[in-house]
Each structure stands twice: as structure tokens, then as C-alpha cells.
């Protein structure tokens, strides 16, 4: 076989921790990360329980332009990827010298679609949605954005 897949690092950003070490500790301590979300109750969901993931702060990592063009899912995935790269001891030079790709699982990106519809209904103008809305609404948005940010040249796939 001339090509192979190697998993070299791990990273996580979740409701039970924002690093491998935090998640491991939460699992040992039996912490769930599940909270009662009043907003979900007000929207009429049958269950107001949800995993509360802390808001990501990317000001030290990405430019303003990069930050406004990515959705919440990509923010979390970006921080998990940074941890995975550190875990694997991979630096920027490695990307220039090797064909690297990523594989991410993504359930949905419905928030971007809902936000766009809300803007159109309120303002009656599709121009206010912004050109980046289409990319935020794609299930492949995480992989697409991360492959651009990290200048990846390998196969990049989204499983959903």
C-alpha cells in the first residue's frame, strides 16, 4: 500500500472539558456537562437539557476576518485541532513539507441557516445575510475552514 493513514494527535473541546486532560478528569469524577437551558424551554423543546460548551475565544489565534467567517462548530473544532497538533508535536513547517488532511464528524450546522432566515424576516433584505452565510450553513464547513486556515493539501473529509 503506497498511502496510509496515521492518527498522530488528539484534541477535544466539549461540554465536559476543553482539553484531553479536563475531559479525562471529568470522566473520572462523573461530571456530565449537561445543564438546564431556559432558552430551549422558552423555544418549546420537550427537553431543556443540553450540553453547555464554553464560548470559544479565538482573538489570540485568528484574524478578525477569519473569526467572522467561521461558525461556532468551527471555533470548537479549531481549538481541538490546535490541541491535537500540539499533542502530535506538529508545527506549521510540517504542513508545507507534507500532504496532510483532516477528517471531522459534524452533525449539523442549522444555527447559521436559522440566523440567516431571522435576518431576512426582520430586515426584508437578503443582502444583509452576508456572503459567508452559505459557507457557515454547509455540513462541511468545519473541514473546509480548517483546511484553509491550516493550508492543508491532503484529503479533507466531513462525516455526517
What are these regions (language model features)?
Residues 1-155:
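Conserved "HGTGT" condensation-loop signature of ketosynthase/thiolase-family condensing enzymes
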Residues 158-160:
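Short beta->alpha junction loops
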Amino acid at each position: 500500500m503506497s498511502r496510509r493513514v496515521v492518527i498522530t494527535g488528539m484534541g477535544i473541546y466539549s461540554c465536559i472539558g476543553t482539553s484531553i486532560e479536563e475531559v479525562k478528569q471529568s470522566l473520572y469524577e462523573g461530571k456530565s456537562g449537561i445543564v438546564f437551558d431556559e432558552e430551549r424551554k422558552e423555544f418549546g423543546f420537550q427537553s431543556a437539557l443540553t450540553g453547555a460548551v464554553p464560548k470559544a475565544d479565538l482573538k489570540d489565534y485568528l484574524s478578525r476576518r477569519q473569526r467572522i467567517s467561521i461558525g461556532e462548530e468551527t471555533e470548537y473544532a479549531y481549538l481541538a485541532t490546535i490541541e491535537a497538533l500540539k499533542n502530535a508535536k506538529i508545527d506549521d513547517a510540517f504542513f508545507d513539507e507534507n500532504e496532510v488532511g483532516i477528517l471531522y464528524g459534524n452533525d449539523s450546522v442549522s444555527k447559521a441557516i436559522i440566523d440567516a432566515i431571522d435576518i431576512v424576516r426582520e430586515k426584508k433584505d437578503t443582502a444583509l445575510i452576508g456572503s459567508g452565510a452559505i459557507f457557515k450553513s454547509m455540513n462541511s464547513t468545519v473541514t473546509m475552514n480548517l483546511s484553509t486556515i491550516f493550508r492543508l493539501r491532503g484529503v479533507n473529509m466531513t462525516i455526517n
